[in-house]
Amino acid sequence: MEYLCDYTADDHPFRFNTPKNNLISVPYTVELNEIPAFMNVGVSSEAFGDMIIDQFDVLYEEGATNARCMPICLHTFFVGQPNKFKHLKRAFEYIAKHDHVWLTTGDEVNDWYRKEYT
């Protein structure tokens, strides 16, 4: 195992020094996980899209001088439903139109972090 996505401690990846290897923590968020948002908090599909955009706006501004990670935890069986998907699509289209944004995966964040910082 090279990395985990269990800690909500930071918007940056960070390294754990372990006896066998350097384990990377790739950021994770509970706030932008659609299952708790819809089922526990009861937000609407539109509100979830707005939450993504609002979080992005803050992190994009903060990231102007120091890059940030913004994980969005999704499950296709849930947010992939047509009544929910249109607002997710709206949020991704909003994010994608900004400069210096990398839409990526945890694997790629791990690879990038190891190349740059270890």
Language-model segment annotations:
Residues I53-T118:
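C-terminal domain-boundary segment and adjacent tail
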Residues M1-N66:
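Active-site-adjacent pocket scaffolds in enzyme catalytic domains
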